[in-house]
Amino acid sequence: MSNKRVVITGIGVVSPAGRKLDVFFDNVTSGKGFLKGIDRFDASGYPSKHAGIIEHLDAEEAFSMRMLKKLDRFSHIALLAADDAINDSGIDIKSEDKERIGIILGNALGGWAFAEEELRDLHRLGVREVSPYQATAWFPAAPQGQISINYGIKGFGKTIISDIASSHLAIDYAARAIKSGRADVVLAGGTEAPVSPYALLCCNTSGELSLTGSYKPFDRSRDGYVIGEGSAVLMVEEMERAKKRGARIYAEITGFGHTSDGTSPTGHDPEGKGIARAMKVAIDGAGIKPDDIHYILPAATGGINSDEGEARALGSLFGERLNASASIGVPKTLFGNLLGASGAVDAAIACLAMARGMAPVTMGCDDPDTRWKWSKEYGVAVFREIENVMINSIGRGGVNASLVLGRV
């Protein structure tokens, strides 16, 4: 692997908390909540029936209805986020060598809304009434493929399916593709649209969703997370190339750690040894010390064991210095856990936090567990200089990922 430095030069976010970056960041620092009862279909029989929902997607304003009707909502959302990331980066895709542009996206569930409708038609009306676009609309690689088709991208491509860690790994693969010389620029991120009957059922059967509709990680009465739909896509680029074209640089991708618990298909290690190793690998890879981390966006899935394990991992790595050296925030409590897109959304928040000197923290935690000593920062946005950010993901199957971004 070369010593090339890799940076983020464009951001696109489509979320329940907004799409335009200024609006999105203002919302996640204001404490405004975007979780609501699901009314897209009858969710009354589900144990968990709340979500972060994008009220007005308006994909037809940017893309033709002829194309959109062939795609699932998770592709619609990803197309918008990718378009925003490209525009934000200032890169003219048409003038680039498209064989040197990559695209790597993650998701956890695929396009279930489209698939469910076609399965209902199959059951009620028969095989002849199923959409001919079924085969290309639902499968997990559809957003990656459609974005590459839309912009003529012909370089390195990959779709990552690794539960909540999916977009974390997409960002890492993007950085590796650039360091290894396989691409000059890469669109990297994730997308998810889990607010459909079967997708919601799958999430409910995991046992990880909040039954109260409250997403309150590290709270004494935490009972899981609330899902959300959305996408975040980052333009990832080699640093010298970015500087040469006068690009705005949000952050450098400096470290990444990826481990497995090897313990349970659905549960999480309450000791947190796997995520602790991932964090250490990421920090060591960045060439810094734990004290140099100023802002932490934990996985914070709100489960009894998952939060316990992550809290122990943070304590083992940072010790008593944690509260003094770093702010800890879980802004996704406002708009939901975007599953396979959550890591990329957190990375977008981290970039904006470094640029603005403001760290969004955690809302909705009314009774923080006092065993963990960062409770003083719940419910407020912290103004501070931020040089390095650490972002964690913990997925089902014991997948752990930690990413470190540094200010340039």
Residue spans of the language-model regions?
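ACP-dependent fatty acid/polyketide chain-elongation machinery
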Residues: 1-67, 89, 240-252, 348-363, ...
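Structural signature of cysteine-dependent C-C bond-forming condensing enzymes
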Residues: 1-3, 89-104, 117-132, 149-157, ...
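Condensing-enzyme catalytic core mediating Claisen C-C bond formation in acyl metabolism
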Residues: 5-9, 32-36, 213-288, 294-295
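Conserved beta-ketoacyl condensing-enzyme motif
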Residues: 8, 23-25, 29-163, 191-199, ...
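Conserved small-residue
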Residues: 8-10, 28, 82, 103, ...
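Glycine-rich phosphate/pyrophosphate-binding beta-alpha loops
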Residues: 16, 109, 163, 303, ...
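Short acidic, glycine/serine/threonine-rich loops at helix termini
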Residues: 18-19, 114-117, 171, 196-202, ...
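Glycine-/small-residue-rich "gating" segment that lines the acyl/pantetheine channel
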Residues: 124-131, 169-172, 176, 192-245, ...
